[in-house]
Design a protein with these regions (language model features):
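Short, charged early-sequence alpha-helical segments and their helix-coil boundaries
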Residues: 42-55
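Polar/charged, Gly/Pro-rich intrinsically disordered segments
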Residues: 44-46, 82-95
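Negatively charged, low-complexity tracts enriched in Asp/Glu with abundant Ser/Thr
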Residues: 1-25, 54-70, 74, 78, ...
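Amphipathic beta-strand/beta-sheet edge segments enriched in Tyr/Trp
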Residues: 29-44
Length: 95
């Protein structure tokens, strides 16, 4: 099994209500791809490289899970439209 197949096989073990997971080869590296199932929202796709040594390591399933969860967190945080730290955020009236 080549590295891309190994990553794809591991990702098939995960099923999420909101997100789709896949992997691709891009510029000579393997990337984790995370997308919303509802593509109509027009939000970006998240890409994260996976290091070859991680794929080859005997603990790959655990490392992949940690990386997947970290990337999911980052992806969801990137979806904020406004935060208190936003420079252009005008104060909002409480509802």
């Amino acid at each position: 099994m080549n590295p891309l197949e190994k990553v794809r096989a591991e990702l098939r073990r995960y099923d999420h209500a909101l997100l789709d997971f896949s992997a691709r080869e891009h510029n000579g590296t393997i990337e984790l791809v995370i997308e919303l199932k509802d593509r109509s929202l027009g939000l970006h796709t998240y890409y994260a490289p996976i290091h070859p040594r991680d794929i080859e390591h005997p603990q790959f399933p655990w490392t992949m899970q940690r990386d997947l969860y970290d990337c999911m967190h980052d992806y969801l945080v990137e979806m904020f439209i406004r935060t208190p730290q936003s420079r252009d955020a005008a104060p909002q009236d409480p509802a």
